[in-house]
A protein has these predicted regions:
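Short functional linear segments
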Residues: 1-58, 65-67, 71-78, 102-103
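N-terminal phosphate/diphosphate-binding loop that engages ATP/GTP or pyrophosphate donors
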Residues: 43, 67-120
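Hydrophobic alpha-helical packing residues
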Residues: 69-74, 144, 443, 493
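Flexible active-site lid/hinge loop adjacent to a nucleotide/diphosphate
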Residues: 101, 116, 122-132, 136-216
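Short, high-confidence coil segments that cap the C-terminus of an alpha-helix
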Residues: 130, 149-150, 389, 472-475
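Nucleotide phosphate-binding/pyrophosphate-handling subdomain across enzymes
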Residues: 151-156, 164-174, 179-182, 192, ...
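Internal gly/pro-rich beta-alpha loop/helix module
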Residues: 171, 185-192, 197-200, 205-292, ...
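C-terminal helical cap/extension that packs against the catalytic core
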Residues: 212-233, 242, 257, 345-362, ...
């Protein structure tokens, strides 16, 4: 089926405009409850019941965890579906399928399938008053069924209990962590938020909990698991090395290397990961805990054995899946390095582009206090350096409903004696962006230095302003504050 590119683009725009999406209108797009999603799925023949799945929720880290786990399963030879949100540059980033380890990378859903699915079902969606996320979730389930995937890794959109994805009955449930975000929908106290996330734990289905240190939160998860007769494992109850050892032992009791070999392998694994942020080590621990349970599932065990025990650990498909998760799954915007060529165009550092400006550029989609508690410290430490500090320039934007009072104290300011970060405040893309002047006023009043770049979608103008007016060789430039800031970057060869 050949489609007209203009018709395809117009159809996608109509979906964004006619059906409420979180990217466009924020909370007004949130339609809690599963009745409408169940009706949509029923009209489509309940495709979600025709493939195995793994369900992942959490305040932060659920996207990275989804991609790492999908990458490992792919490299071990399974045909994997991957559903995540939001997208950065191409709607189709949300829905991907692999053909197993023989393929170089996971592939986005075909434009033809998107077009045909929307044209065939538009009237149904309008009649049911579906949300944008319900439509994309239905599309993902339908596509994974069509592709006959072995397993689909499904990331929750918002919350868990009432999220559109929660009509699946997975093989494993994972909750990465609990923090305060979207509190007006999920609750203002951590146990309330945990209760919403815990809604993805299903009857008899094993559950992995990532970061959970507060007893009140742990209690919520334990009680939910007990009521569902579900085995529950807290990944921070053991070290990554202990989870790796358990994974290998569950695959084959005779195969587990000694502690020294495991320690050396893990250090090498972390150093080679193309998902670079230090926070990825917490996500990796959750993935290893998840794999230790999948190793007990007969459906997954054989593929995992082939991918993990076929050679020395460092040379296995299992290791490759972790080390190259970003490349294999096409995940971008997680502590990602960029380069600027001699004409000021941005490229992924993983490309062959030659740097024309001697500046270290990092972009990250972290967008809430829980996220900045991780990235803020890492940015400041990187700028402070081990010998002489570097100048730190922050291109920063956020959405209008962001709780700035919780984020501002976590932003880098004076990161070394006599060195203060300089901020270029920007409008992120979309109608939800906080105006750069409003953002600047709030942050500068807290003792920061910087200026507002006044332009509609001012992210690229801010970068151009930096190159023209502020650039010095050796600078560290951070771009982030929101997924929409990173999505506004014009990166050569981005999807």
């Amino acid at each position: 089926m050949n489609i007209n590119e203009n018709e395809y683009r117009k159809l996608l725009e109509s979906i964004f405009n006619r059906f409420p999406s979180f990217q466009r209108v924020g909370g007004m797009a949130y339609k809690p409850g599963l009745e409408r999603m169940e009706s949509i799925a029923n009209l489509l023949g309940n495709p979600q019941d025709k493939f195995r799945s793994i369900h992942i929720a959490g305040t932060n880290g659920k996207g990275s965890t989804s991609h790492i786990l999908a990458s490992v399963l792919n490299e071990c030879g399974l045909k994997v579906g991957l559903y995540t949100s939001p997208h950065l540059w191409d709607f189709r980033e949300r829905i991907k399928v692999s053909a197993g380890a023989s393929a170089s990378a996971m592939q986005m859903i075909e434009k033809e399938y998107v077009y045909r699915f929307l044209m065939q079902n538009m009237a149904k969606f309008e009649e049911l008053q579906a949300s944008f996320f319900e439509i994309t979730t239905a599309m993902a389930f339908s596509y994974f069924c069509h592709c006959k995937v072995d397993v689909a890794v499904i990331e929750c959109g918002l919350g868990g209990r009432l999220d559109s994805t929660n009509i699946i009955v997975p093989q494993l449930s994972i909750i990465t962590n609990i923090g305060k975000d979207h509190c007006e929908y999920l609750g203002y106290e951590l146990p309330q938020i945990a209760s919403e996330k815990a809604g993805i734990i299903k009857e008899g289905v094993p559950a992995i909990i990532g970061e959970a240190t507060e007893e009140s939160v742990c209690r919520v998860f334990r009680e939910r698991a007990q009521s569902c007769n579900s085995p529950i494992h807290f990944s921070n109850s053991a070290s990554p090395q202990e989870w790796l050892s358990l994974y290998l032992n569950n695959l084959s009791p005779a195969s587990s290397p000694d502690a020294a070999e495991l320690s050396a392998f893990l250090q090498q694994l972390v150093s080679r990961m193309d998902l670079r942020g230090s926070y990825q080590q917490k996500n990796l621990r959750a993935v290893l805990a998840a794999l230790s349970q999948l190793a007990l599932n007969p459906y997954f065990a054989e593929a995992l054995r082939r991918g993990t025990l076929a050679a020395k650990l460092a040379a296995t498909p299992f290791a490759k899946g972790i080390e190259e998760a970003s490349r294999i799954t096409g995940l971008h915007g997680r502590w990602e390095h960029l380069v600027a060529d001699s004409e000021g165009r941005l490229h992924f550092a993983s490309s062959s582009a030659e740097a024309g400006y001697q500046v270290e550029i990092i972009c990250d989609t972290g967008h809430n206090a829980h996220g900045f508690a991780q990235t803020g410290v890492q940015i400041a430490a990187l700028a402070a350096g081990t010998d002489l500090p570097r100048r730190l320039i922050m291109i920063f934007g956020c959405v209008a409903d962001k709780d700035l009072d919780s984020v501002i104290p976590l932003l880098p300011n004076e990161y070394a004696p006599g060195y203060k970060a300089y901020y270029l405040f920007v409008n992120a893309s979309g109608s939800r962006a906080m105006p750069s002047q409003t953002l600047a006023k709030r942050v500068l009043a807290a003792g920061f230095s910087g200026e507002a770049i006044v332009a509609e979608n001012s992210v690229m103008p801010a970068f151009e302003h930096y190159l023209a007016k502020l650039y010095r060789p050796g600078d560290l430039l951070f771009i982030g504050g929101s997924s929409y800031v990173v999505a506004s970057l014009k990166i050569e060869n981005a999807q």
